[in-house]
Design a protein with these regions (language model features):
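Short, contiguous clusters of charged residues that form electrostatic/catalytic patches at enzyme active sites
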Residues: 20, 24, 95-98, 102
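Glycine-rich loops and low-complexity Gly/Arg-rich segments
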Residues: 33-37, 72-74, 93-96, 137-139
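C-terminal edge-of-domain segments
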Residues: 99-139
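Conserved mixed alpha/beta catalytic, RNA-binding, or beta-rich assembly cores of soluble enzyme
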Residues: 1-52, 129-131, 138-139
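Short linear motifs at secondary-structure transitions and domain/linker junctions
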Residues: 42-46, 87-90, 100-105
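Structural motif
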Residues: 6-8, 45-46, 67-69, 109-112, ...
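Long, charge-dense
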Residues: 48-50, 54-97
Length: 139
């Protein structure tokens, strides 16, 4: 059975973040990794957020027509991230919420394309994880 690649963008952000912060982070992520969030190869297939951060990411998903996956906040510390932010470790128990969320949402065996990016206003972060999904299986 042939596998297809699932691209999941995970988000982390401060309370002060706006929809524009997340949108800019997603655009920057897409530009950095050459991904587009429309149909086709290299697309960002899904967005992901911790349950406590869900409403703003759901709004972005509605605007960009991208499905959103929810990750349990309690799962964040179970993931090894590339970034080790002291502030994130203290607040959420993980080195990067965006990286942890992307990996958890993409599923077992997922890998990050690189460390998280930070929005221009420094209020949001985004990371892109990839996983192989057997053809015919949907999440």
């Amino acid at each position: 059975m042939k596998a297809q690649t699932l691209h999941v963008a995970g988000f982390g952000f401060r309370r002060e973040a706006t929809l524009a912060s997340l949108g800019q982070a997603l655009d920057q992520l897409a530009e950095q990794y050459g991904a587009i969030y429309q149909c086709g190869a290299g697309a960002i297939d899904k967005l992901a957020a911790a349950r406590s951060m869900l409403p703003l990411v759901e709004e972005l998903g509605r605007l960009r027509n991208i499905e959103v996956i929810t990750v349990a906040d309690a799962e964040l510390p179970t993931v090894t991230t590339l970034t080790h932010s002291a502030q994130s470790l203290q607040a959420r128990g993980t080195g990067s919420v965006a990286e942890a969320v992307a990996l958890l949402a993409a599923g077992p065996g997922a890998t990050l394309l690189g460390p998280r990016i930070i929005s221009a206003d420094r209020q949001a972060t985004a990371a892109l994880a990839l996983s192989e999904v057997p053809e015919g299986i949907t999440e």
